[in-house]
Amino acid sequence: MARVIRWQLAKRRLGNHSVKTRSEIKMTTAKMYKQKGTGKARHGSGSVSQFRGGGMAHGPVLHSHSHNLNKKVRKLGLKSALSDKFKLGKLIILDSSKCDGKTSTLKKKLDDMGVGKTLVISGSEVETNFVKAANNIKNLDLLSYKGINVYDIVKKENLIIIDDALKFVEERLS
């Protein structure tokens, strides 16, 4: 699971921090002033790092932090995350996502189940009333079966899978 989480977080990183080096600065490369006779130190181009407006030496460059991870390892990580939640008794399967659209009723249902930070995985057809009710509840995340991932499962205390999403999850793991 740790490898899969590290892979997910590395893929998520942007890595778009960048500065201009002396070759990227738009400035003349001609000598600033003559070598001798001025009383000043000798200098060449004005684009070097010690001058204002010059390029930075050894600064951050644009690069990707992502790395490869085999599909079998990713699938194994997802299996172990789901089985871990099941062993701890933190996996709940709901038969439907029927809801009247009121946040208070859904919150009361969740409190009756005794769940705190929760991830809800829905099937292909998510009821709009359920989404409306779930959007306003703190510590409740709603994911489609397509977006199921190890990091979100591990991050939340409880996992609720709606019955129509269960077959898609089983299909993905087989």
Identify what each model region corresponds to.
Residues 1-14, 60-174:
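Extended polybasic, low-complexity segments that bind anionic RNA or targeting/receptor surfaces
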Residues 23-31, 47, 100, 132, ...:
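Charge-rich, low-complexity amphipathic helices
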Residues 16-20, 40, 47, 93, ...:
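Residue-level detector of alpha-helical recognition elements and their boundaries
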